[in-house]
């Protein structure tokens, strides 16, 4: 595995080899000051970007461009390599776009947070089940050129949370955001929202419709640990069986009354609010 700054591929900074279990040692890389990711008015990019070139005998090479490194935070880059196919020689290249708090993405189109589920002919689960896998459509719903990916539910949540918030934020802020992401996702699963519209996927990667998921992006350890702790949970209201479609926005470029705001949840976490207190602050006391 060779590591270089994204945009300067010829300058290899580190070369590492995986051990018998397929893991590398921890590599220290430069990143901007941690404060940049804690200040919503900071215009500078709060993470550095690296390109990883991964090669193994008998497997197709993979290049990941734009792996994000935040200060004082362990980043984890999971890679699954495919065995070499003699008919194909080119390497797989994944370009990781900007983090949603830094880049420009379309804001969420508002929806009802509780879906009608008594219409005829709908397939709806009788109880809330945490799925093992979900199918992610990597584009907007009607983009038939976008690829569908089978993703483990836990890995999906870790990817979305790593794309939507910064892992440097307070742990209870991360918990509140992870709960909102999981509840939103489980609402899509429980109501079979897209399948009932004739699509063959669970959720999309478009921020206008759902939340950001990025193929092969790195995740961050503080987020990963919290998802492992909470992954069977979701948010509900009294006398409502389905998980609530907990919508949110960044709260800086986009404002969204009655939804969680990501930057606002960070300051509540800094003030000592618990995860459920953060969520009730935005979604109301019966959450």
Indicate residue ranges for each PLM-predicted region.
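Conserved, single-site charged/polar hotspot
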Residues: 17, 27-29, 53-67, 71-287
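Short, solvent-exposed coil/turn segments
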Residues: 11, 19, 47, 72-74
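A short, solvent-exposed beta-strand micro-motif common in secreted/extracellular proteins
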Residues: 34-58
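Short, acidic Ser/Thr/Gly-rich low-complexity loop/linker segments typical of extracellular
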Residues: 8-38
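Conserved aromatic beta-strand anchor motif in extracellular beta-sandwich/beta-rich domains
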Residues: 3-5
């Amino acid at each position: 595995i060779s590591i270089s700054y994204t945009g300067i591929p010829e300058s290899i900074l580190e070369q590492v080899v995986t051990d018998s279990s397929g893991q590398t040692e921890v590599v220290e890389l430069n990143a901007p000051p941690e404060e940049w990711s804690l200040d919503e008015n900071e215009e500078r990019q709060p993470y550095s970007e690296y390109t990883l070139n991964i090669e193994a005998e008998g497997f197709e090479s993979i290049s990941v461009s734009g792996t994000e490194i935040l200060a004082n935070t362990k980043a984890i880059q999971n890679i699954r390599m495919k065995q070499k196919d003699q008919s194909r020689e080119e390497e797989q290249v994944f370009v990781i776009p900007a983090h949603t708090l830094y880049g420009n993405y379309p804001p969420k189109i508002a929806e009802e947070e509780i879906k009608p589920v008594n219409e005829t002919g709908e397939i709806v689960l009788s109880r809330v089940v945490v799925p093992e896998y979900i199918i992610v459509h990597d584009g907007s719903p009607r983009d038939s050129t976008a690829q569908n990916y089978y993703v483990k539910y836990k890995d999906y949540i870790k990817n979305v949370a790593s794309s939507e918030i910064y892992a440097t934020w307070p742990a209870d802020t991360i918990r509140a955001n992870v709960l909102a992401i999981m509840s939103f996702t489980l609402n899509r699963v429980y109501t079979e929202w897209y399948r009932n519209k004739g699509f063959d996927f669970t959720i999309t990667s478009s921020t206008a419709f759902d939340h950001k998921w990025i193929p092969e992006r790195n995740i961050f350890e503080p987020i990963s640990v919290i998802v492992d702790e909470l992954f069977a949970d979701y948010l509900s209201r009294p006398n409502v069986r389905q998980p609530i479609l907990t919508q949110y926005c960044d709260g800086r470029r986009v404002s969204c009354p009655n939804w969680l705001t990501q930057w606002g949840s960070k300051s509540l976490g800094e003030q000592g609010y618990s995860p459920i207190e953060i969520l009730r602050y935005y979604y109301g006391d019966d959450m």
